[in-house]
């Protein structure tokens, strides 16, 4: 069983590459196939069916070579993003089979169905790569890092097309800003680009460098008649030769005319001489209504009025809260005074009650002394 499936893996490795099925270039796919051989197949497929299954799988794998090789479908190369998408789809379906724990004939059917499906998915991804990603430049030279499926190697590919990207007609009014744009849609995807250089081209074919840098724009403020003429932009690369060359023919137009209109509060002589006409509404369709003077409310005035109302309401609430606080304070103060008076009255009453027995005793003592004195005086008189 191990030998048969090893041969099957060899067939996969040998047949997928000539058929330019690039998923075999992904190390994760190779690891998944190895895991399938060592862990899944020994317990899910009977040994007597290995030879027949292997032949059928080899035939199915050879069918990957049916991909048409032409400029519009497949050239035997892909980019890294397309390879990742194809590998992810293959690994997802293979994991689905192993997670389902299918065995025997059902496993074989699932495996064949997965191989056919992955062939169609890979063909779709490659066709999209050929149409949208592979050499999208219409002019100039573009550099791309691509993967050659027959070798599983990354190499730099140069999409060489006409270096002349045409001439652009630029019209700008005097005293306005002139902007020359040298950026193309494929520049961000190209590799090995350096600086944008803008030149002024004179009549004797000589050139003057105006700017050089990473910015793809040349801006000239307040242009005049002397700025009219021919310009050239060149995008340099790390290799020999530019990636893009664009020419510009600049025409400086006269300044824009500004129509002067009288202010609305000044009445012209024509308006004074013209009698006021009263527009009478008619039954004709879409009559012109008589202009009615309306008071236009500016947003600033509305905002100021709203803020003023909010301030007034806030001030009223503040005054009301202050008045309520003062009344509450006075009320609590009166209550405290009343409680103090009551406390003092009760203390005075208690003191008077305490002093009353002492006063009674003193009164009795004074009366006794009075009687004693009076008796002594009577005795002295008798003597």
Curated annotation (Swiss-Prot):
Extracellular-facing ranges: 22-306
Superkingdom to which the source organism belongs: Eukaryota
Keyword Oxidoreductase: no
Positions of the UniProt region annotated as Important for interaction with IZUMO1R: 148-160
A single BP term in Gene Ontology: single fertilization
Residues modified by glycosylation: 204
Residues where Phosphothreonine is found: 372
Main localization of the protein described in the UniProt heading: membrane
Annotated knockout phenotype: Males are infertile and spermatozoa show impaired adhesion to the oolemma.
GO molecular function: protein binding involved in heterotypic cell-cell adhesion; protein homodimerization activity; receptor ligand activity; signaling receptor binding
Keywords carried by this UniProt record: Cell membrane, Cytoplasmic vesicle, Disulfide bond, Fertilization, Glycoprotein, Immunoglobulin domain, Membrane, Phosphoprotein, Signal, Transmembrane, Transmembrane helix
Cytoplasmic side: 328-383
Residues making up the signal peptide according to the UniProt record: 1-21
Bilayer-spanning residue ranges: 307-327
Compartments where located: Cell membrane; Cytoplasmic vesicle, Secretory vesicle, Acrosome membrane
Other noteworthy facts: Izumo is the name of a Japanese shrine to marriage.
Comment block on domains: The extracellular domain assumes a distinct boomerang shape when not bound to IZUMO1R/JUNO. Interaction with IZUMO1R/JUNO triggers a conformation change, so that the IZUMO1 extracellular domain assumes an upright conformation.
Subunit structure: Monomer, homodimer; disulfide-linked and homooligomer; depending on the context. Interacts with IZUMO1R/JUNO. IZUMO1 and IZUMO1R/JUNO form a complex with 1:1 stoichiometry. In gamete recognition, IZUMO1R/JUNO first binds to monomeric IZUMO1. The weak, but specific interaction with IZUMO1R/JUNO induces IZUMO1 homodimerization. The process follows a tight binding phase where IZUMO1 bends the entire structure towards the sperm membrane side through a thiol-disulfide exchange reaction. The molecule no longer binds to IZUMO1R/JUNO and instead binds to a putative second oocyte receptor.
This protein's name: Izumo sperm-egg fusion protein 1
Organismal lineage: Eukaryota, Metazoa, Chordata, Craniata, Vertebrata
Record gene name: Izumo1
């Amino acid at each position: 069983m191990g030998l048969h499936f090893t041969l099957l893996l060899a067939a996969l490795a040998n047949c997928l590459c000539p058929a330019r099925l690039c998923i075999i270039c992904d190390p994760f796919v190779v690891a998944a196939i190895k895991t399938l051989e060592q862990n899944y197949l020994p317990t899910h497929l009977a040994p007597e069916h290995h030879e027949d299954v292997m032949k059928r799988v080899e035939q199915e794998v050879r069918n990957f070579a049916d991909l048409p090789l032409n400029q519009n479908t497949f050239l035997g190369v892909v980019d890294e993003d397309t390879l990742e998408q194809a590998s992810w789809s293959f690994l997802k379906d293979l994991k689905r089979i192993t997670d389902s724990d299918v065995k025997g004939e059902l496993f074989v059917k699932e495996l064949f169905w997965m191989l056919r499906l992955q062939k169609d998915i890979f063909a779709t991804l490659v066709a999209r790569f050929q149409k949208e990603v592979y050499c999208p430049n219409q002019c100039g030279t573009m550099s791309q890092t691509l993967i050659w499926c027959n070798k599983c190697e990354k190499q730099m590919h140069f999409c060489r097309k006409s270096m002349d990207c045409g001439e652009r007609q630029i019209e700008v009014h005097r005293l306005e800003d002139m902007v020359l744009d040298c950026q193309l849609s494929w520049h961000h995807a190209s590799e090995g680009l350096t600086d944008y250089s803008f030149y002024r081209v004179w009549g004797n074919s000589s050139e003057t460098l105006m700017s050089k840098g990473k910015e793809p724009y040349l801006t000239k403020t307040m242009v005049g008649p002397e700025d009219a003429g021919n310009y050239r932009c060149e995008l340099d690369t790390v290799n020999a030769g530019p990636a893009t060359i664009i020419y510009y023919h600049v025409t400086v137009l006269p300044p824009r005319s500004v129509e002067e209109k009288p202010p609305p509060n000044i009445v012209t002589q024509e308006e004074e001489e013209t009698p006021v006409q009263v527009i009478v509404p008619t039954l004709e369709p879409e009559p012109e209504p008589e202009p009615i003077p309306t008071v236009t409310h500016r947003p600033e005035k509305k905002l100021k009025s709203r803020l003023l109302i909010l301030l007034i309401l806030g001030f009223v609430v503040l005054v009301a809260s202050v008045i309520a606080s003062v009344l509450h304070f006075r009320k609590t103060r009166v209550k405290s005074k009343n409680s103090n008076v009551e406390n003092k009255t009760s203390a005075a009453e208690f003191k008077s009650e305490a002093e009353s027995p002492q006063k009674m005793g003193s009164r009795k003592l004074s009366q006794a002394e009075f009687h004693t004195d009076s008796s002594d005086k009577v005795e002295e008189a008798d003597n």
